Amino acid sequence: TKAFSTQLAVVYLIGLYCAEALGTLDEAEYDRIVSELLLIPTKLEQILDNRADIQYFASLYFNHPSIFFIGRNIDYAIGMEGSLKLKEISYIHSEAYAAGELKHGTISLIEPGTLVVALASYVKLFDKTMSNVVEVKSRGADVLGLTVDARAADMAKTVDHVIPVPDTHPLLLPSLDVVPMQLFAYYVALQRGCDIDKPRNLAKSVTVE
């Protein structure tokens, strides 16, 4: 949602300001991050231009009783946001799990036909996350994957469907990754006939203690 994306932008700016003030980021890296930050709106438009694909994926899976999200590091956090949005507006049971924790009980929830949304946008963690994808696939799960353009072809060899996001500086990936997750929740809710603008039992802001 707009609040989540705006908070990310504010945190980026605060982080850059502090790094510059403390001298913990060299000038070249600082300039690179700022340049990529300015390109985020354009790259978000690219994602929105491909939203028909996400709508199609939603049409395939909107009747699933449970949908699980997995990811490592910040991908896990974005998975939690995607799972939360899905629960809020589509009323589907959904949980997000750290991919590295799958073997500690979570994987017992996977059965044939279960949908797992796997986020693997960080190149350094891609192979480890994909090893978890192989584990859930071997147990019959359907997998919808999200990764950067540079690794989309590799991911497509294992998962059922891929949502690619434009490449950017690793620190800025959450701003791109979160939008397909929110769109997926939106289109799933539409398919289910839910009132997206007025989710049940939710208020726009917290007004009571």
What residue ranges belong to the model's regions?
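Active-site phosphate/pyrophosphate-binding segments
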Residues: T1-L115, A189-E209
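Glycine-rich phosphate-binding loops that contact phosphosugars or nucleotide phosphates
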Residues: T1-L39, A120-V162, F184
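Active-site proximal loops enriched in glycine and acidic residues that flank catalytic Cys/His/Asp
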Residues: G71-N73, G82, A98, A120-V123, ...
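Alpha-helix N-cap/helix-start and coil->helix boundary motif
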Residues: D75-Y76, A152, M181
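Composition- and surface-driven signal marking solvent-exposed, interaction-prone regions
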Residues: E81-G82, A98, K128-V133, T158, ...
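Glycine-rich, anion-gripping cofactor-binding loops and their flanking helix/strand elements
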Residues: E101-K137, T168-Q182, L190
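Generic C-terminus detector
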Residues: D142, T168-E209
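A cross-family phosphate/adenosyl-ligand binding-site feature
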Residues: R151, K157-V178
